[in-house]
């Protein structure tokens, strides 16, 4: 009997030891796991954080049917207006002027790459993308431009792409079925010339310019280097032109409007992030 009692006591003690030991091991495992999580915590630079802020904008531009619908709406409206205009006599040939980026060609893959790599725009990385000649047309652009071309309308592309990128851009456009009526119909950024207004006036010298297309207010008038207040005033003066002579498209990814948030100052990533938050309009609880 005593032997059985001793055996029972030993068995119970051993069980308690094993349970306690397992609990301690589990506790140590949890502690080690938490320490591992702490050790693998990722820290982002200000430039990476700034780049990441563009994620939802790029996703909307690439994935949202609403984005495509806005392009279709703009180009269908332009087609109807052009049909009406073609029935009217003109001394000079009709012409239209279009920006290229996010107006005719979709460059959102370049923006996406910057997000994934935690980088931002540089002339060098942008040129790599342009030289690949892989940008696709935005919804409705090809059909509208082919219609305009077939009806004798002069098509000019006024872009702030570098003059050295004309050949690659022409190849990209032609590959996607976008009409290019000659090298002289691509008016790109020349050294020392920032505003697009002079290039628009050049088109007006020999043609009857009837419509302008773009994703940025500088594609329609001289909105460059203006404060938010000045841009608002100029917009109110031109508001009757939108949906008529001016066709504007959505671009939440970048644009000249952003400089208004920074008051025209050239800020580093850290200060840009701060100014963005300060510019938000919220409400009191």
Residue ranges of predicted features:
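Non-catalytic pre-domain segments flanking phosphatase-related domains
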Residues: 2-3, 9, 19-98, 263-285
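C-terminal cap/substrate-recognition subdomain and adjoining C-terminal extension
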Residues: 26-29, 44, 162, 166-285
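Soluble non-cytosolic domains of exported or imported proteins
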Residues: 50, 65-72, 76, 92, ...
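Sec-exported extracytoplasmic/periplasmic mature domains
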Residues: 83, 87, 110, 146-154, ...
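Surface-exposed patches in mature extracellular/periplasmic domains of secreted proteins
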Residues: 86-95, 155-160, 185
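Active-site neighborhood of HAD-like aspartate-dependent phosphohydrolases
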Residues: 88, 93, 104-135, 150
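Ser/Thr-glycine-rich phosphate-binding loops at phosphate-binding pockets of nucleotides
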Residues: 103, 158-160, 215
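Short, acidic loop-to-helix structural element flanking the phosphoryl-transfer center
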Residues: 128-155, 163
